[in-house]
Amino acid sequence: MGVYGICVSNGQLLVIRKTIGPYTGKYDLPGGRMEPRESLETAIRREFLEETGYNIQALSPIGTCDFLVKWTLSNHEDELVHHIAILYKTVVDTGKPANSIISFEGQDSCEAVWVPLTELTTGHSSPLVLQAIDWVRSGTLPVKASCFDYRAQP
């Protein structure tokens, strides 16, 4: 379970590029797991700063998404991950320039970029990004779990 932010400005979504896990090479939303004794808001602020370099100016909860993700581990074994995401609408603090992405052991992203919503497609976006696009367009999130298969094809 993790907390993630949807940040849209001028028709573009702020996304990160994943370097490990089932979404390797894909765009994903900034966010991640809470640390012990960390509130949801504290976690999303920390994750945004670590992964994008931006401080968040405003927050409002949107809802949750529920995914089952099939993928192939580096040892070629298949795995099923149950991913529960708590989503927040976020706005970056435009009064402060973005810092560089924080590098640390376990960092799972390599860059943060603003991508036009029209350019984010299934082929290079995580399920969270796809749900974010649907939410921006419709104002609603699905109530049922979705299943995605990223297993390596023989």
Stretches with model-predicted labels:
Residues M1-L13, A85-K89:
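Conserved N-terminal beta-strand and adjoining loop/helix that marks the start
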Residues Q12, I20, D66:
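Short, glycine/serine-rich, charged loops/turns that create anion-binding
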Residues P22-G25:
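A conserved beta-turn-beta hairpin within the catalytic core of GNAT-like acetyltransferases
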Residues M34-Q57, L68-P127:
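Unchanged
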Residues P61-T64:
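Residue-level recognition of beta-strand microenvironments
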Residues V129-P154:
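Charged phosphate-binding loop/patch that engages nucleotide di/tri-phosphates or the phosphate backbone
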